[in-house]
Amino acid sequence: MKNNNRLKINLPGFELKNPIMPASGCFGFGKEFSELYDLSRLGAIIIKAATKNEKFGNPTPRVAETSSGMLNAIGLQNPGVDHIINHELKELEKYDVPIIANVAGDDIDDYVYVAKRISQAKNVVALELNISCPNVKNGGIQFGTDCNVAYNLTKKVKKVSSKPVYVKLSPNVSDIVGMAKAIEEAKADGLSLINTLIGMALDPKSGKPILANKTGGLSGPAIKPVAIRMIYQVSQAVNIPIIGMGGISNVQDVIDFISAGASAVAIGTANFINPYICVEIIDQLESKLDELNVNHIWDLKGRSYR
């Protein structure tokens, strides 16, 4: 039986027409992709990170290809939250698609400022806190590697945000479940995982790091097994929804992430290889459900442990 709502997903604060969205940092603000297809077809868009002030990013080279993936050390280059609200978000108002705003900062005050400002934008339905940023006031340690720091950050942002808050977890921790539980305790509305793994690539001739920053975030198919494992663990430990990401490049990957416990997924690096990847997967999802003999995509959620 044909059911037009087979892909619809309800998350705290908003509804998705399908569970597919581009991940932050791999889609910019959608401008280039809007020339290829109607952005309203997407479940949502997670826009590029917003910071309090304009950031010019790290020195080049900032990207390096690796086996089954890529490294990036972009450095959160963006025009600043005020510009994003007044220009990029305004431009996205013409599309019927929920916007999730990725929020970053050098310290807790920065996060609070950006979250308060950008949550007021009318087409922003939720925030995604990028807690993989280095805490400048705490020796550069990532917010997302200390449960207490992540708890406090989440709690403070929740107080000022008028929209649901999702926290993007770093995989570069020894206890991802402990981190997820701390963030749930701070009243986060949801989680997104995983962010990139820290990696390095060397120039074969000089033997020196290719990236000017030396290390970068590893993404792409190489990290999918890590993402699946972490989502499998976290989804059984918390009662808030997960947006899954990390190495998705085809429709079967989407099924795997939802089977592991994700409620929706975000596609990152694959957009660089095939800019149509999100809509192609959306087009293939219903056939995949037929193949698996299930009526609604939600029926697959968490089947790996049910």
UniProtKB/Swiss-Prot annotation:
Residues that coordinate or bind FMN: S24, K48, A49, N102, N130, K168, I194, G220, G246, G247, G268, T269
Cofactor: binding details: Binds 1 FMN per subunit.
Catalytic center residues: C133 (nucleophile)
Name assigned to this protein: Dihydroorotate dehydrogenase B (NAD(+)), catalytic subunit
Cofactors that this protein relies on: FMN
EC number: 1.3.1.14
Keywords for this protein: Cytoplasm, Flavoprotein, FMN, NAD, Oxidoreductase, Pyrimidine biosynthesis
Subcellular location: Cytoplasm
Cross-referenced PANTHER family: DIHYDROOROTATE DEHYDROGENASE (FUMARATE), DIHYDROOROTATE DEHYDROGENASE (QUINONE), MITOCHONDRIAL-RELATED
Subunit organization: Heterotetramer of 2 PyrK and 2 PyrD type B subunits.
Pathway it works in: Pyrimidine metabolism; UMP biosynthesis via de novo pathway; orotate from (S)-dihydroorotate (NAD(+) route): step 1/1
Gene behind the chain: pyrD
HAMAP family: DHO_dh_type1
